[in-house]
Amino acid sequence: MLPARLRTFFFPTCLVAFTALVTAFKLQDALGLLPCLLCVTQRALLAGYVLVCLSAVLHGLALEGQRRYAQLALGFALGGAAVAARHVWLQGVAADDLVCPVAIDHNAGQYWNELARQLFSGAPDCNALTWSFMDLTLPEWSLMAFVLLAAFALGHLLAGRLHALLTHDLKQR
């Protein structure tokens, strides 16, 4: 049986992240949206977050192992938030101001550093406002999801730190 601490953090956050990932794929399929390079990167980071949380649930590690998994999950969430924030910013820029005029299909054979440069330079397909719900675009929803997932991981890290400080303080008395 898994410790209660793992069930209360990693399993629910895994479900939240998995739901967000499935929703992104379902929206793409239902609305016929073509994902740009930033969308694909956000989904990869979200999938990484899901895998980290799922691994933490399956491993059932002690407090130190949980902390490492939470740090890794926080890294994926912050990376996803950075990519989503960049995507939101690019959607506010005029298409003529984008540096990269080449779509993702043409970038596949290039080196990783060139691909990374073009990832953050932007492409015309990253600028398109193709869908919104409650006046928020899909990258804005992704940004909110990544911030929420980062808050979950950070909360777990801070709670573990507070627990360690309190137990250390009680041992000294």
Predicted regions and their residues:
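C-terminal TM-helix exit segments that contain a strictly Trp-centered aromatic cap at the helix terminus
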Residues: 19-28, 79-94, 112
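Juxtamembrane loop-transmembrane helix junctions in multi-pass integral membrane proteins
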Residues: 1-8, 34-40, 61-68, 130-137
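Extracytosolic (periplasmic/ER-lumenal) interhelical loops and adjacent juxtamembrane/interface segments
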Residues: 91-137
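Alpha-helical transmembrane segments and their immediate interhelical/interface regions
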Residues: 32-79, 172
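Interfacial segments of alpha-helical transmembrane regions
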Residues: 3-15, 61-83, 151
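A hydrophobic membrane-anchoring alpha-helix module
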Residues: 120-173
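Transmembrane alpha-helical insertion/packing segments
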Residues: 1-48
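Juxtamembrane transmembrane-helix termini
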Residues: 27-30, 59-63, 90-97, 155-166
